[in-house]
């Protein structure tokens, strides 16, 4: 499965060690391209309405072998959606996101909303500040004992089970947006989360 990196606009403070060679395609979304250049990573695609990218950076990009896809600002999709649409067969890719931090609150909520509607949501990983955000239905993940994590039900969850945590659940139904599974603590080296149906977001 190939890896795709998408760098969103807004702030980007992740300290995740990104290596260009890990990714088959690298997409800079508007001023998200700046985050890539700051990390000495050259995108092969820069797209969006390009209204927030630094003019000097855009000028530099135009001299490079980078595919530029410019869209009118009056469009029906966000730049993030356009980035996803540009990926060939996203169901077969692992998609990693950086950026998108501390921008306008509607942009933040739209990213979560957009991801939850994709059938390949489980393929996405978002490195947000010092956290990792993933979207899953079932997961068994190694986690240092004492680590904090939160589970956010993106949809209604049926028979949610959590083991390896301070506050465990045994096949409990939770409604979308429930706060019951926020701010938990791992008490084992392996955290297991599963549900019969539904999609949740794990932040750790």
Where do the model's predicted regions map?
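Histidine-anchored nucleotide/phosphate-binding helix
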Residues: 32-37, 83-84, 111-115
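Short glycine/serine/threonine-rich phosphate/pyrophosphate-binding segments
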Residues: 14-15, 77-80, 104-109
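Active-site/ligand-binding-proximal alpha/beta "capping" segment
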Residues: 82-94, 99, 170
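General beta-strand structural signal in soluble alpha/beta enzymes
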Residues: 27-30, 70, 125-128
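Short phosphate-binding loop-to-helix
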Residues: 68-90
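Long, charged alpha-helical interface segments
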Residues: 136-204
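N-terminal beta-strand-loop-alpha-helix module at the start
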Residues: 1-60
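Anionic-ligand-binding alpha/beta catalytic cores of soluble enzymes and soluble regulatory domains
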Residues: 94-137
């Amino acid at each position: 499965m190939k890896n795709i990196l998408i760098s969103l606009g807004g702030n980007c403070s992740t300290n995740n060690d990104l290596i260009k060679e890990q990714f088959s395609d690298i997409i800079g979304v508007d001023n998200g391209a700046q985050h890539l250049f700051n990390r000495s990573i050259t995108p092969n695609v820069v797209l969006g309405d390009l209204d927030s990218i630094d003019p000097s950076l855009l000028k530099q990009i135009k001299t490079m072998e980078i595919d530029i896809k410019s869209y009118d600002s009056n469009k029906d999709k966000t730049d993030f959606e356009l980035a996803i649409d540009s990926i060939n067969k996203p169901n077969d890719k692992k998609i990693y996101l950086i950026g998108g931090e501390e921008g306008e609150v509607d942009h933040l909520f739209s990213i979560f909303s957009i991801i939850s509607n994709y059938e390949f949501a489980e393929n996405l990983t978002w490195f947000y500040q010092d956290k990792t955000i993933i979207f899953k239905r079932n997961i068994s993940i190694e986690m240092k004992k004492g680590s904090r994590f939160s589970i956010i039900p993106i949809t209604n969850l049926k028979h949610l089970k959590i083991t390896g945590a301070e506050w465990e659940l045994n096949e409990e139904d939770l409604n979308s947006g429930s706060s019951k599974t926020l701010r938990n603590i791992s008490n084992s080296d392996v955290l297991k989360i599963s549900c019969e149906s539904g999609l949740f977001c794990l932040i750790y």
